[in-house]
Amino acid sequence: IHLSLWFYIFLHLIHARMINKIGILCTYSFPEGMAPTIRILSYGQGLVDNGCKVEVVIFQPKVGDNAYSLSGYVGGVKYTYAHKRDTNKSKLYKLFVDRPKSLLNAIKKIRNSHKEEKFDCILLSFDYPIYLLFFAPVLRIIGIKVGFIGDEFPEPIRRLKSSIPFSYKLAYKFVYQFISFRVLMTEALQRFYNELVCEKPTYILCSILNTARFDGIVKQKVSRKYMCYMGNMMLAKDNVDNIIRAFKRVCDDFSDVDLYLYGTPNDKDKSIVEGVISELGLGNRVFIKGRIDYNLVPQTLANAEILVTSQPATKRAAGGFPTKLEEYMMSHTPAIVTNVGEIHYYVQDNNTVYLVEPYDDVAYAEKMRYILSHPQEAKEVAGRAYNYAIANFGSKEVTKKLIDFLDNTL
């Protein structure tokens, strides 16, 4: 009996969770922001739900006003900005004073927190070589293991280039001497880094969402029915013009449904979108709604007749997975999605979403028409999408697997 008890205790110790505290270092706005912010917040809340402590350090100098303070807790996730930029200073001051202060303060905050309770690892959620060259070696010198989170190809490819400069390759090869593992969004990214830099233990995490945001959300009556696009409206990433042209083909047959575009495009992209709207005579049917409050997203998606997104078939699209897709699927609203990258690995046409090939506004319009003409069937598809998202994209479930990966890797 005693031997059996000791054997049970031994097995329990082997399988016990060893990951207790994780840091995430990033450059973008937090806790409010676009897709990268939403993903990191979902990572953090999922890890917290699984019993980990999570600290997010934002080292880019803070820009603009934010409803949140420079440090605090959101959903159990601790966050802090390394430095607040003085927006009245010159560009040279920001470059040579603000930026170094931010980098050094980030290290100081991480080191102090590490002294209080050791980090099991720090996840670097950026791919800029100059920052990787600074943070990865310094963190290892401090005694913290380092991992890399990647949800897109590096910057030149995000700008629709076919490859990255030779200098980037050299920088990555050096930096990865200090990085222990990767958490990547797609298999395409894994192949890219394995072939370009070196192989590392890799966990594929295509999508993640704090599903609790959608608890209790039901469709409400609205004064005017609408289809909804929600994203950053960057045309290199989301060719919204394809959606508008498709809508033009069906709008006369469904005169009670408008098209709402939520997002904050840059001036150039906004001008192009406005030009397409004007060219097609849709000024009274298609509306650029601007940025929407993070907390209003679930209800806005749920109230729509159709959720739409469109991506061009680019190398950039091959490396990523649209964060908006899991939000769409959680809303109980039917969604039209372009079949690019690895999306078809996870969703099926007419089963969980409505897939359409990229650039084909005629086929896209037919999907719109079909959904609006078959509301009951579309509702069933949306219901299956919700169940799939709960089972496969929920932050607690996904990060539990991530913790298992880290336990076996670190």
What is the predicted role of each segment?
Residues 23-25, 220-238, 243-247, 260:
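Conserved donor-binding/catalytic core segment of Leloir-type glycosyltransferases
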Residues 42, 107, 111, 130, ...:
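Membrane-proximal helix-turn-helix segments that form the acceptor-binding/catalytic region
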Residues 145, 172-217, 230-231, 286:
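Donor nucleotide-sugar binding/catalytic pocket of nucleotide-sugar-dependent glycosyltransferases
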Residues 230, 258-272:
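Glycosyltransferase donor-sugar binding loop
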Residues 271-296:
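Nucleotide-activated donor-binding/catalytic signature segment of Leloir-type glycosyltransferases, i.e.
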Residues 301-318, 333:
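Acidic donor-binding loop of glycosyltransferase active sites
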Residues 306-309, 327-330, 334-337, 354:
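Short hydrophobic beta-strand element within catalytic cores of glycosyltransferases
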Residues 349-361, 370-375:
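Conserved acidic donor-binding segment of nucleotide-sugar-dependent glycosyltransferases
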